[in-house]
Amino acid sequence: MIKIISGIQSTGSLHIGNYLGSISKNINLQNKYQLNLFVANLHTITVDFDPTQARQNIIELVKIYLASGFDTNKNNIFLQSEINEHAALGHVLLCHTTMGELERMTQYKDKKQKFVQSNQTIKIPTGLLTYPTLMAADILLYQSDYVCVGDDQKQHLELTRDIAIRMNKRYGELFKVPEPIIAKVGSRIMDLNDPSKKMSKSSLSKKGIINLDDSREEVLSKIKSAKTDNLNKVNFDYKTQPEISNLVSIYYGAINDHFNLGLKSAKFNKALDEEVVPIDIIKHFENKSYKDFKEELFELIWNILDNIQTNMKKITDEDVMRVLKSGKDKLLPIAQKTLLKVYQKLGMVI
């Protein structure tokens, strides 16, 4: 079976951008492929974090995946830090990467500006620079066919492929070179009140974020107050109508979510496995107002959140521990086999 690897950081307080941009897409893939999903808690510590919340954040993240419909009978979820081969292979890959390659990463360039000191020096955590090689290890360790990443991780995946090709050429076949799965629409959900900024829990305005644990009233209020323009015409063009285009992107992700299959069929007369695309949404709301659009958007978003919140109440911490152990037990032998092969090719085994 074709295998996909995907990771998500356990930073707490997940929002609809996290869900539609990553979780929902992973859930939709799991019936066609074997999905190996890891909680990327080693990546979480590359920047400032709260160790007192780390364990609970992991538990909550796994609960959300299970509540969202992650099928552990066919797929695996595991904790990155429990498989030491991630860090070990990460070091090997780091030794086959140049400083120039790492410093060219756009995310590194953007994030390092946050560490400018009062005297204009920059105090950058080393983990921020070396993040891409650990990510490369996460991917290459399991010989996956595809990797599901967000648009903002595309450059990191290109570096991963470069490293794999480089090492395969030098040492012989070590790694399968993975192909990306990157959604063209909906992989990057923007703030409801500022479509120039990615939806983030660190946003100054909480009205721009729909959290997965928001109440019905909170979701309704946030969608009603979401910024639009004065054209009152549903369209999908980020250059001319960025506000409504962002909401259409959210609608697109929500209508194609597995929790909304019934609503998709009723509203668009689509087969269960047939995707609603932005042009369908524009036609659906032709001659309708933004008010009509927001009412339907609320219906879709709340149906997702209501299902997740209801399912979450049934999942215990013990369920999480059992699922993580099962995932580790299945993935550890694969990781060990890959790392041993690398060590042997590099002459590191006596």
UniProtKB/Swiss-Prot annotation:
Signal sequence bounds: none
Broad class of where this protein is predominantly found: cytoplasm
MF annotations from Gene Ontology: ATP binding; tryptophan-tRNA ligase activity
GO BP terms: tryptophanyl-tRNA aminoacylation
Pfam families assigned to the protein according to its UniProt record, in alphabetical order: tRNA-synt_1b
Known EC number: 6.1.1.2
Annotated motif 'KMSKS' region, positions: 198-202
Location within or outside the cell: Cytoplasm
Record motif 'HIGH' region, residues: 10-18
Keywords carried by this UniProt record: Aminoacyl-tRNA synthetase, ATP-binding, Cytoplasm, Ligase, Nucleotide-binding, Protein biosynthesis
InterPro entries in alphabetical order: aa-tRNA-synth_Ic, Rossmann-like_a/b/a_fold, Trp-tRNA-ligase, Trp-tRNA-ligase_bac-type, Trp-tRNA_synthetase
Residues reported to bind L-tryptophan: 138
GO cellular component: cytosol
Residue sites binding ATP per the record: 9-11, 17-18, 150-152, 189, 198-202
Organism domain of life: Bacteria
Protein family per UniProt: Belongs to the class-I aminoacyl-tRNA synthetase family.
Its biological purpose: Catalyzes the attachment of tryptophan to tRNA(Trp).
Protein name: Tryptophan--tRNA ligase
Gene name of this polypeptide: trpS
